[in-house]
A protein has these predicted regions:
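Periplasmic binding protein-like
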Residues: 52, 121, 388-439, 476
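Short, solvent-exposed loop/beta-turn-alpha elements that line the ligand-binding surface or hinge
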Residues: 42-44, 66-103, 138-139, 180-212, ...
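Bilobed periplasmic-binding protein-like "clamshell/Venus-flytrap" ligand-binding domains
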Residues: 172-178, 204, 360-378, 415, ...
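Append "and occasionally in soluble cytosolic enzymes with long acidic Gly/Pro-rich linkers
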Residues: 223, 273, 280, 300-388, ...
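Surface-exposed binding/hinge segments that line
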Residues: 101, 147-189
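Alpha-helical secondary-structure segments
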Residues: 51, 125-132, 160-166, 206-207, ...
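Aromatic- and charge-enriched surface segment that lines or borders ligand/interaction sites
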Residues: 98-142, 158, 164, 298
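Ligand-site clamp/hinge motif
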Residues: 224-270
Length: 525
């Protein structure tokens, strides 16, 4: 993918090369046809509206309050940008910051690009960066993302185009968290005038400008004609909510839409057999699991959690529900994330041990529980398989299916018994999994939907945050993840593989490892 940010130096170089080529062509006696000349001048086709069909609508569009991928996918690298960004290999590259250096272990200095404006005309500068992070870190803001940046002690404006982040302690994955959606820089004008409106009307510096949101129907973004970098080829992108799986694919085939960014595995054969559609597959950084609300009975008893962990046949879910798309997970961290360990041992499938544990917990005659899931087809199928499996130990499972936004609301309030869930990693670093999923400070909206609290686990997670030695960090993550499994907080199910369908008339898009749709270079034929 062509880098969309170019320095002035590179621009001058390209101009000189272009002049030399023109001179060489003028001196040549070889004739060229008009078609050849036209093809050299045309470049990527411009214009058109990209329609992306999705199962679920966004819940909010303020990056300081977004806690789900469907919402982040609307604004990340489209409306909003951060100081840095990950490339296709998840290596950090400059974005709004053109360069940076570590002055000492706890002071990071960023030199900012000049001449950039937010969509509302406000200038991008060091003060804008400070205002964004001051708002995020202010306890009064009550952002669920605050703890992810809690290592930042102060944001210091050095001059108009230089800003320093002063940390409480050395934090190795700082650039990775700055490259996430949570690190988006927000217009200071919008923050000052009406910060509450950012939930429905985002204002950033990105290649697309927010246009409209018809709740439950569609969100529209238009091309930023004043974008500071390489402008998008398309005029507009519309994210359209279409709950029915078959209808979304039919819209791709008929040309009503170009991308379906979440496709059930049962539709793979249909897509591959189509002459209008193509299949996009990529390994992601997400893990799917069954999680227990450990503050609610009967899951406040570890014996009950262990019993159910022993009674879920995970391999059968991978094969029967997912058709072997994705791989069996052994922990709440993808193998592609720094911190993963293949030494973590989940509970074996053992019905006799499960029954024994239930008897010890006082449930020899069985019990009734509710299993919550979102309305994704595979999640519902998984719930039905688990319901059937748990009958074998006398557990009567009621399945509760909710639209995605309502599902998120319920688990963030802790109103569920057990839930099928997933966690995507936006940084590629284990801290994003461990701190958000298991630290006591992250209970609720930040990500700890297990409502798990263990002082020893908290200490190990915090130690891994502060440790700069990679081998020591890996050892800490290995120890803490086995402890979480031993406490039976969740049952790991699947390492995620993202599947999308797209029209053969569209090119240039890709999905990054965090499952974000990247459309900077999209061309509609």
């Amino acid at each position: 993918m062509e880098r969309k940010r170019r320095t002035i130096k590179n621009g001058i170089l390209f101009v000189l090369i272009g002049l030399m080529l023109m001179i060489a062509q003028a001196c040549s006696t070889k004739p060229s046809t008009s078609n050849e000349s036209a093809s050299k001048q045309e470049g990527p086709k411009q214009g058109g509206t990209l329609t992306v069909v999705r199962l679920s609508d966004a819940t909010k569009l303020d990056p300081h309050f977004i806690t789900d991928i469907p919402s982040a996918n609307i604004v990340y690298q489209k409306v909003y940008e951060g100081l840095v960004e990950p490339d296709k290999d998840f290596k950090i590259q400059p974005l709004l910051a053109k360069e940076w250096k570590v002055i000492d272990g706890t002071t990071w200095e960023f030199k900012l690009r000049e001449g950039i404006k937010f969509h509302d005309g406000a200038p991008f500068n060091a003060d804008a960066v400070k205002k964004t992070f001051d708002r995020l870190l202010d306890p009064k803001t009550a952002s669920p993302q605050r703890e992810k940046f809690s290592m930042i002690k102060e944001v210091k404006v050095v001059d108009e185009n230089t800003v320093q982040l002063i940390l409480e302690y050395p934090y190795a994955p700082l650039l990775s968290i700055l490259a996430s959606n949570e690190g988006s820089i927000i217009s200071p004008k919008a923050l000052a005038e009406n910060p509450d409106s950012l939930s429905q009307h985002p204002v950033g510096t990105g290649p697309f400008v927010f246009e409209s949101w018809k709740t439950g129907q569609e969100i529209s973004l238009k091309k930023n004609e004043n974008y500071w970098g390489k402008k998008p080829n398309i005029d507009r992108v519309v994210f359209k909510v279409v709950p029915e799986d078959a209808t979304r694919l039919a819209m791709i085939e008929t040309g009503e839409a170009q991308i379906n960014d979440q496709v059930p595995v049962t539709e793979i054969d249909r897509i591959e057999a189509s002459d209008k559609m193509a299949l996009y597959r990529t390994e992601g950084l997400a893990v799917e699991y069954v999680g227990f609300n450990v503050k609610k009975k009967p899951f406040d008893d570890v014996r009950v959690r262990k019993a159910i962990s022993h009674a879920i046949e995970r391999e059968a879910i991978i094969k029967g529900v997912y058709n072997n798309v994705g791989t069996l997970a052994n922990e709440a961290m993808s193998p592609k994330v720094f911190g993963y360990s293949d030494k973590i041992k989940p509970y074996d499938y053992d019905l006799n041990e499960a029954k024994k544990l239930l008897k010890e917990a006082g449930y020899e005659k069985g019990l009734k529980v509710t299993l919550l899931t979102s309305d994704r087809k595979e999640r519902i199928n998984m719930a039905e398989v688990i319901q059937s499996q748990l009958k074998g130990i006398g557990v009567d499972v009621k399945i509760q299916v909710m639209e995605y936004g309502a599902y998120i609301g319920m688990i963030e309030k802790g109103e569920h018994d057990m839930a099928i869930g997933g966690w995507g990693n936006a940084t590629g670093d284990g801290d994003y999994n461990q701190y958000n999923l298991f630290h006591s400070a992250s209970q609720g909206p930040p990500g700890n939907h297990f409502y798990y609290s263990n002082p020893d686990v908290d200490k190990m997670i915090e130690a891994a945050r502060r440790e700069s030695d990679e081998k020591k960090r890996l050892k800490l993550y290995e120890e803490v993840m086995q402890k979480e499994i031993d406490d039976a907080v969740y049952v790991p199910i699947r390492n995620y593989e993202h599947i999308a369908a797209y029209s053969k008339n569209v090119s240039g898009f890709w999905l990054n490892a965090a499952s974000y749709l990247m459309i900077d270079d999209v061309v509609i034929k």
